[in-house]
Amino acid sequence: MAYERQYYPGATSVAANRRKHMSGKLEKLREISDEDLTAVLGHRAPGSDYPSTHPPLAEMGEPACSTRENVAATPGAAAGDRVRYIQFADSMYNAPATPYFRSYFAAINFRGVDPGTLSGRQIVEARERDMEQCAKVQMETEITDHALAGVRGATVHGHSVRLQEDGVMFDMLDRRRLENGTIIMDKDQVAIPLDRKVDLGKPMSSEEAAKRTTIYRVDNVAFRDDAEVVEWVHRIFDQRTKFGFQPK
């Protein structure tokens, strides 16, 4: 019988959403063009070539290596792309994703990525075209509600601030906002103004966000209501504590 990955315990909607994020089997909610993605990221001009940091691997004449022969380079590494990033902040008020689960999603579903997890933001670094592939999936699917999440390369504050009156997460640099029922972004991730308004789609209703979130909250799905999750968290902490002290 083929092994089926379990990813995460639990019987609640939050646990199911966490499994979906980790598996990469995500529902696509919106379309973002490659040019709009490039504009939002701000690393190069839309339509321009990828700058490189070294020649393509095929031209470098590297020495024989069994690992290199068995593990194909990612497209970005093969082309010699420089390393670039995308960084998200996710609201504590039922945003679909959390920093840890963005990192799990990236590490499980993409090669050559370096996810970084902090309390209020999450960054993925990779060769530029590889990073863009990971970024596009996150920006187009249910892992992101652009009213409750922001692409923020600098001044990331807002994840723990209560939502604005229009239901949008606060952004001190005003990179994106609600206009005519959709979220638009007219600055890149470090707040440099764009020559266009990038349409990031309609925000989720508060009811839909509560169904799609990966966050346990006492006013939605409480952590202690998911008995299997509590059991496994206790088991992991118990074993880490005991064996961290190396009991004799």
From Swiss-Prot:
Transferase is among the record's keywords: yes
Enzyme Commission no: 2.8.4.1
A GO CC term assigned to this protein in UniProt: cytoplasm
Keyword terms of this UniProt record: Cytoplasm, Methanogenesis, Transferase
GO molecular function: coenzyme-B sulfoethylthiotransferase activity
Primary residence: cytoplasm
Manner of cofactor binding, per the entry note: Binds 2 coenzyme F430 non-covalently per MCR complex. Coenzyme F430 is a yellow nickel porphinoid. Methyl-coenzyme-M reductase is activated when the enzyme-bound coenzyme F430 is reduced to the Ni(I) oxidation state.
Domain of life according to the entry: Archaea
NCBIfam families: met_CoM_red_gam (TIGR03259)
Quaternary data: MCR is a hexamer of two alpha, two beta, and two gamma chains, forming a dimer of heterotrimers.
Similarity-based family: Belongs to the methyl-coenzyme M reductase gamma subunit family.
Name of the protein in question: Methyl-coenzyme M reductase subunit gamma
Organism: Methanosarcina barkeri (strain Fusaro / DSM 804)
Lineage, uppermost ranks: Archaea, Methanobacteriati, Methanobacteriota, Stenosarchaea group, Methanomicrobia
